[in-house]
Structures are given as structure tokens and as C-alpha cells.
């Protein structure tokens, strides 16, 4: 199956399963090296990144969900996102590149209308393509989401949603819709 189509299907399934809604943030970490069958960090591929970006971003944009793209470890896993998603965020001064930030972060930075790079966020859901470890950018409490699509290209796909923390103990009553 085509990489763009895999990404479209995966993000649609995640939106439905995780109940992601307008205004929410979806963080994506991606190793294009892993997608093309190489070891993470060794074969960054801008063309593959463009397919992944197009597959995910087009679905999110029509649902008014913000895309946050995690940079690689060389940029401390910083986040590329549209400024309007985080209007009061403090940006850091860096422009992602293929070998410093990664191909997907570079494509996102060059594709967004008004991109900023920030050190961290707390997203509502996430997609990890190629075991890049996105957990640091998810709200507590993260819950794994199992999708029918297990891989994007050759890369392992892991997804998560979040739920609010339970507080109050045995006497508390919880909102079932937030689980």
C-alpha cells in the first residue's frame, strides 16, 4: 500500500478511535529512515516525508485539528507547529533541516503558513512512526491506541490518546465520556 494512503487511513482511524476534535493537537514523530527500511537517523528521505505529511496533514486540516511534528534528537525533539495553535508559546530559534530536525519536521516547517518551533507541548494524541518516542509531548495520561495499520512503509506505527487524570478516590464520580 502507498505510504500516503497508509498515513491517511491511520490518521482517520486514530481520530475516530481517540475522539480527537476540532482544535486538538496531534503530535507526530517520524523516522523516514525507518519508513524506507534503514536504521533510524541514517537515511532521512524528504520525498517520503512529503508523502507522510500530505497523508496526515490533509486529513487533519479538513477537521481543524492541529499537526505538531517532532524534530529528531539533534534538536532535542523540539516541535514544529502552526503559530495559531499555540499563540502564547515561547519559540526557539532554529529552522529544521534534513540532518538536524529530520525530513518530516523540515517538510512541516516549509509547508505550514506560519510555523514556529517550540521546545515542548502537551498534545491530545500522537502517532509514532519508526519508534521515535513522542511520549514527552503527550498530556497525562497516555493510553495506547491499536489501529488496523501496524506499519507505515517498513516503520513500526504506535499511536496514543490521552485522558484526564482520575482524582478524588473511592467517593468520586467520573465522566464516562472522558475515559
Which stretches of residues belong to each language-model region?
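Active-site histidine-anchored catalytic micro-motif
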Residues: 35-40, 44-51, 58-77, 100-101
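Fold-independent oxyanion-binding glycine-rich loops
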Residues: 30, 38, 70-73, 155, ...
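Short acidic, glycine/serine/threonine-rich loops at helix termini
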Residues: 38-40, 79-82, 169-171
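Solvent-exposed alpha-helices and their adjacent loops that cap or buttress functional pockets
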Residues: 18-20, 100, 146-151
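N-terminal glycine-/serine-/threonine-rich phosphate-binding loop
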Residues: 1-26, 30, 42, 46-61
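Generic secondary-structure signature for well-ordered alpha-helical cores
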Residues: 12, 16-19, 57-65, 109-117, ...
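Glycine-rich, aromatic-bearing surface loops/beta-hairpins
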Residues: 106, 110-179
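Ligand-binding beta-strand-loop-alpha-helix segment within the catalytic cores
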Residues: 63-125, 130
